[in-house]
């Protein structure tokens, strides 16, 4: 009986330590930050990996040809250091050709999106050069072909041509091409969505002169960072 009492005494003397409850400060942070303009991203404390979705700027429409869509990545993982500051450059959409402005606005390629030293994403080519192969450098082994802007379609005879649609992108549709009215130029081409190419202009050819609509601008790029 004395041994039983001793056992009970020992058990009662044991101090059971409870595991402390986890607080928000002890848990890894989670969130999303979107950039449509240049800026900086500060990696939250305790975060060692981020997911990036991003694209360059779409190319502007040129002549009757739509601009190219930009290169893009979707939820690609990158290793980072906590509290690191990463500069972000968001590629701007290229300008669409406008022969009616003074001076004339020439079409331009879409801008490049740069995310620190992690990745560089090419913008789309301007329209009018669909023979080029657009191959974006994504870092590592990945290579994605951009979607080319469609060539403008002829409206037949000597009346001229409607504009081609801009090349699409992961985030937006290409701009619509300019249109021809019965006797005059119709609507201007529209701008591309995010990262997409602008539509090509319409052109009408007369006996003594020609008239043109405005080609669409490419859409600006975007950067979305998740952690």
Predicted regions and their residues:
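Enriched but not universal
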Residues: 1-51, 222-227
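Low-complexity, intrinsically disordered segments with a bias for serine/threonine
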Residues: 5-10, 158-165
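Extended low-polarity, hydrophobic cluster-rich segments
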Residues: 13, 73-75, 170-171
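Residue-level detector of beta-strand structural context in well-folded domains
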Residues: 31, 39, 76, 111-113, ...
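Glycine-rich strand-loop-strand elements at beta-sheet edges
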Residues: 34-37, 54-117, 131-134, 198-224
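Short, hydrophobic/aliphatic alpha-helical segments
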Residues: 48-56, 125-126, 149-155, 185-189
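Terminal beta-strand-rich extracellular "head" domains
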Residues: 64-69, 118-129, 140, 146-149, ...
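Collagen triple-helix signature
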Residues: 93-96, 136-142, 149-152, 160-169, ...
């Amino acid at each position: 009986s004395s041994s039983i009492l001793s056992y009970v005494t020992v058990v009662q003397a044991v101090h059971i330590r409870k595991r402390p409850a986890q607080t928000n400060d002890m848990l890894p942070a989670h969130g999303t930050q979107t950039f449509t303009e240049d800026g900086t991203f500060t990696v939250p404390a305790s975060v060692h990996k981020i997911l990036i979705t991003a694209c360059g700027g779409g190319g502007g429409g040129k002549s009757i040809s739509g601009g190219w869509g930009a290169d893009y990545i979707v939820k690609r993982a990158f290793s980072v250091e906590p509290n690191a500051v990463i500069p972000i450059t968001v590629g701007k959409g290229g300008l669409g050709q406008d022969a009616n402005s003074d001076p004339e606005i020439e079409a331009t390629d879409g801008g490049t999106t740069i995310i620190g030293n992690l990745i560089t994403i090419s913008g789309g080519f301007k329209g009018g050069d669909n023979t080029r192969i657009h191959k974006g450098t994504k870092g590592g082994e990945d290579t994605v072909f951009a979607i080319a802007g469609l060539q403008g379609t002829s409206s037949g005879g000597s009346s001229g041509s409607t504009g081609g649609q801009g090349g699409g992108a992961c985030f937006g549709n290409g701009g619509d091409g300019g249109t021809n009215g019965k006797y005059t130029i119709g609507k201007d081409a529209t701008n591309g969505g995010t990262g997409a190419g602008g539509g090509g202009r319409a052109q009408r050819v007369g006996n003594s002169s020609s008239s043109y609509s405005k080609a669409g601008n490419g859409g600006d790029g975007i950067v979305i960072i998740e952690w």
